[in-house]
């Protein structure tokens, strides 16, 4: 069910030192999970309601194509020799030649009256690896058909010449096993030159190629270890996808111990004084070597699918924000395709819930879709539903008697339209409000921060109370003072109402 994604072989050399204690990584929970597989489905386990929080639509986040965050991890500087990162692949190619053994045949048929028919044919001649180096060879430019040998009134008179000639052919050389790798070889590889090919008349011969364990091409990288569990998580290099180490094991090669990654790559660690020594279980098999040439295309295919899934998720996020509603189908786009600790989402009664929980790869779903079997599990388990009912689960999973899984339902011709039913999203209230009010009584309630502006507002909000308590005595005091001031002032004579005209006349 799982599609393993592989990349060309790398050699990772970590410079860190010697003398220290041994720490066994905790691999009980995540080491059994396929790191770079794309399972049919992933689902949270042990993700209870107390691990979830309500979030707004803007807080949703699409899963990353690769988990490139290193929070809570210790980084070990490393040097990596990678066949996939370097631009120059000339060092891993071995120059050689195809040795051909071909019979050049001219056929002549002569009639009674002297008429002739000339035919030419190439015949494969079986060539063994031992014979390939025993004869002198020529070049393809020097090949020719022999002159016809004709006899009167005789058909099919043959004249043959056998040639050994070479054509240039370079092949890959596995730097670990030193095997020659090419699709021309039987089984795709050859241990020692000369090598038999799929054609009975062609043998490949080449030089020794690159030496085993060669580390001439190196790049800078890091190895990451979890601070709490001391579990080696991954190795990364700029511009390259992370190499998973969840299922890493120890293997002996070139006279020393190596860490073999999930994809079969090898890591050699040299510890500094006082550094913690990382310990892994021994590999059950001794398999080492480069994967086939098609693996690069398989990885690119997985990368394209992951990019398409992320684009679909971003479009779903935009629709959720613009409509302020969510459907089980849209929420399913936020499911991480890889097992491990991931963001998980659920929808319930107008709210979207988010948590960071362990998700497992689902290898098999029962026919009625009510149970599933996790990766490497032997029994089936019911889907966890965090809200205590039998309807809503994680990432759009819903249904009572029939469980609807949008990621699987989309492949059904007559799909259930319940995964398209929208749910309006309520705004997330302040947690302090929820401590005193029910969700139905939240209208008109707000929480503000207590800053300088609010302190000033608080002061003025108490002014009516202060006025009520001290205003009346103050008014009485002002009235008494006014009366006292008025009584001690001398009287002012009243002015005449008019001036008679004759008074003015007498003064003249």
Swiss-Prot record:
Subcellular location(s) of the protein: Virion membrane
GO terms of biological process kind: symbiont entry into host cell; virion attachment to host cell
Keyword field: Glycoprotein, Host-virus interaction, Membrane, Signal, Transmembrane, Transmembrane helix, Viral attachment to host cell, Viral envelope protein, Virion, Virus entry into host cell
Chain ranges on the Intravirion side, renumbered to this chain: 483-508
Residues annotated as glycosylated: 56, 400-401, 438
Annotated transmembrane regions: 462-482
Annotated Gene Ontology cellular component terms: membrane; viral envelope; virion membrane
Membrane topology: Single-pass type I membrane protein
Signal sequence extent: 1-20
Virion surface side: 21-461
Subunit structure: Homotrimer.
Role: Binds to specific receptor at cellular surface, bringing about the attachment of the virus particle to the cell. Plays a major role in the determination of host range restriction and virulence. Class I viral fusion protein. Responsible for penetration of the viral nucleocapsid into the cell cytoplasm by mediating the fusion of the membrane of the endocytosed virus particle with the endosomal membrane. Low pH in endosomes induce an irreversible conformational change in G, releasing a fusion hydrophobic peptide.
Family statement drawn from the similarity comment of this UniProt entry: Belongs to the novirhabdovirus glycoprotein family.
Stated name of the protein: Glycoprotein
Source species taxonomy: Viruses, Riboviria, Orthornavirae, Negarnaviricota, Haploviricotina
């Amino acid at each position: 069910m799982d599609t393993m994604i592989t990349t060309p072989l790398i050699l990772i050399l970590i410079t860190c030192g010697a003398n220290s204690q041994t720490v066994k990584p905790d691999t009980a929970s995540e080491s059994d999970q396929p790191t770079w597989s794309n399972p049919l489905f992933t689902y949270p386990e042990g993700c209870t309601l107390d691990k979830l929080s309500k979030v707004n639509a803007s807080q949703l986040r699409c899963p990353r194509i690769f988990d490139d965050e290193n929070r809570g991890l210790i980084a070990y500087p490393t040097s990596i020799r990678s066949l996939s990162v370097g631009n120059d692949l000339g060092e891993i190619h071995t120059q050689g030649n195809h040795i051909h053994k071909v019979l050049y045949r001219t056929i002549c048929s002569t009639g009674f009256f002297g008429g002739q028919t000339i035919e030419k044919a190439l015949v494969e001649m079986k060539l063994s690896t031992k014979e390939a180096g025993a004869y002198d060879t020529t070049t393809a430019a020097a090949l020719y058909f022999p002159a016809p040998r004709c006899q009167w009134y005789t058909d099919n008179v043959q004249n043959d010449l056998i040639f050994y000639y070479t054509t240039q052919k370079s092949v890959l050389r596995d730097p670990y096993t030193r095997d020659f790798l090419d699709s021309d070889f039987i089984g795709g590889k050859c241990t020692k030159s000369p090598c038999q090919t799929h054609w009975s008349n062609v043998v490949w011969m080449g030089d020794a190629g690159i030496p085993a364990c060669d580390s001439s091409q190196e790049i800078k990288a890091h190895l990451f270890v979890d601070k709490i569990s001391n579990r080696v998580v991954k190795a990364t290099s700029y511009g390259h996808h992370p190499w998973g180490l969840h299922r890493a094991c120890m293997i002996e090669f070139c006279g020393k111990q190596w860490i073999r990654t999930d994809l079969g790559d090898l890591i050699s660690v040299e510890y500094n004084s006082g550094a913690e020594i990382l310990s892994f279980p021994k590999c059950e098999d001794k398999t080492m070597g480069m994967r086939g040439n098609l693996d690069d295309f398989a990885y690119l295919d997985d990368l394209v699918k992951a990019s398409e899934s992320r684009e679909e998720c971003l479009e779903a996020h935009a629709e959720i924000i613009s409509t302020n509603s969510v459907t089980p189908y849209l929420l399913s786009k936020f499911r991480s395709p890889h097992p491990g600790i991931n963001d998980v989402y659920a929808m319930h009664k107008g709210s979207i819930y988010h948590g960071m929980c362990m998700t497992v790869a689902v290898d098999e779903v029962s026919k009625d879709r009510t149970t599933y079997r996790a990766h490497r599990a032997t029994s089936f388990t019911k889907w966890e539903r965090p809200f205590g009912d039998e309807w809503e689960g994680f990432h759009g999973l819903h249904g009572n008697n029939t469980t609807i899984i949008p990621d699987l339902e989309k492949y059904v011709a007559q799909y259930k339209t319940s995964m398209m039913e929208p749910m309006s999203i309520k705004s997330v209230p302040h947690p302090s409000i929820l401590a005193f009010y029910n969700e139905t009584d939240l209208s008109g309630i707000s929480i503000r921060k207590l800053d300088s502006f609010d302190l000033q507002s608080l002061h003025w909000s108490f002014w009516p109370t202060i006025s009520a308590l001290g205003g009346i005595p103050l008014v009485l005091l002002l009235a008494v003072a006014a009366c006292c001031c008025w009584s001690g002032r001398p009287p002012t004579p009243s002015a005449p109402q008019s001036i008679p005209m004759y008074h003015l006349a007498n003064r003249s």
